[in-house]
Amino acid sequence: DLPVDGKYYVKEIFAPDGFVTTEEVQEFTFEYAGEDQAEVSYDFTFENQPTTVELSKTDLTTGKELPGAHLKVTDSDGNTVDEWTSTEESHVIKELVVGKKYTMTETKPADGYVTAESITFTVENTAEVQKHEMKDDVTKVEISKTDITGETEIPGAKLTILDKDDQVVESWTSTEEAHYIEKLPIGKYTLREEQAPKGYILTSDVSFEVKDTGEIQKVAMKDDTAKGKVILNKTDKSSGEPLKGVEFELRDSKGKVLETLKTDAAGHAESKLYEIATFKNGKYDTAIKYYLVETKTLDGYTLDQTKHEVTFAY
């Protein structure tokens, strides 16, 4: 019991869950109401404001709100409090409990973005909007189109990226620099060469996967140069009969003997594979010249002393 005619103060110590404790203090005095009224009451009202938390999902580079990410907020016991898909506006949650910790988790990033790390926050005892931001980085892929050594970028290749449904995602012509792509959605892709540069052989598809990371992911496709070989048939000029055992030397432009060819019973001989051209900075430069010289013939035949020039057409 409180004596009458005294001044008293009422202050809120704890607010209901989801609301902010008011700083308001109410003063009152019990006044004597006469000998017939043993008790005197006093009515008062406190107004509580709900807590307000504003959660932003933004692009790491631009800082703009990023639509399309799947998000949820859980309490310290792992219970889901709210879940939503981000839009071009920040997401607002009211009546989270003051003093409790909550975790914002990205369950699926927007297409072309990387899953962000979860953020944990504590709800403060304030009616002001409490803001928290989660930033997403984009995926980054660097595609190199090189010669077989992997050291020189090859310009002039027509390339295409296909998604898992064989839909074209991007097409370009290679240059002397690697091709850089941002915002490829996480998943599996195929890199396809539609047309090889002059002097190179069309290569097989390269499968790759864009992973959930903001690091640059590198993909390489290598092209081998086209090769050529000399095929010869030696016959009798009059009868057309094949001549077995005739020998030839295949020489380079400086006269160096690369190999000796000897005809078989069908009058046939084939060389090994040789480069058809020189390349400069990955580009076709000059066709390579070879020379075929008959060095040994059969008894009864005249040695052909012609130096036959050989170039390979691409």
Question: Can you name each region flagged by the protein language model?
Answer:
Residues 1-314:
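Solvent-exposed loop/turn and edge beta-strand elements of beta-rich ligand-binding domains
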